[in-house]
């Protein structure tokens, strides 16, 4: 990608308001250029339709209504080519076929770890 962290534009999707605030605070501490948050898969789809230029989407998996897998698939079908990173508390997920089927690029485990976020943002 070649962008500096300060130039990145991220969309964070989580149905839990505390998790959204935590991610937003961490990303702002890291000097991420733009951080937008939405609280549902449908909200993410609406946001991508309005602004398809986000560099990355951090997508919670377990959400009511439309889970992160389904939202990611729909976003990809809209033509979004940026990175989609799954956000999950399920540490027992060893089968990554669901992530691949949803066309997700990486996985972050909750609770989020600053070093893992840096790795994902810098694509290490």
Predicted features by range, described:
Residues 112-121:
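C-terminal output helix
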Residues 60, 88:
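Active-site residues of response regulator receiver
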Residues 14:
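Conserved acidic carboxylate
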Residues 52-58:
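Active-site beta3 strand of CheY-like receiver
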Residues 37-46, 68:
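Helix N-cap/capping motif at the beta->alpha junctions
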Residues 46, 69-81:
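Short amphipathic alpha-helix used as the core "switch/output" element in two-component signaling
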Residues 17-36:
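Two-component/phosphorelay signaling modules centered on CheY-like receiver
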Residues 63:
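Receiver (REC) domain active-site loop signature in two-component systems and cognate sites
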């Amino acid at each position: 990608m070649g962008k500096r962290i300060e130039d990145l534009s991220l969309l964070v999707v989580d149905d839990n308001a505390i998790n959204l605030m935590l991610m937003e605070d961490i990303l702002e501490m890291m000097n991420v250029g733009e951080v937008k948050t939405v609280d549902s898969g449908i909200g993410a789809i609406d946001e991508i339709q309005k602004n398809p230029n986000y560099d990355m989407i951090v997508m919670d998996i377990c959400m009511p209504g439309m889970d992160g897998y389904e939202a990611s698939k729909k976003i990809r079908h809209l033509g979004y080519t940026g990175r989609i990173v799954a956000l999950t508390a399920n540490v027992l997920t060893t089968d990554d076929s669901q992530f691949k089927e949803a066309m997700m690029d990486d996985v972050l485990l909750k609770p989020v770890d600053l070093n893992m976020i840096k790795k994902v943002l810098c694509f290490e």
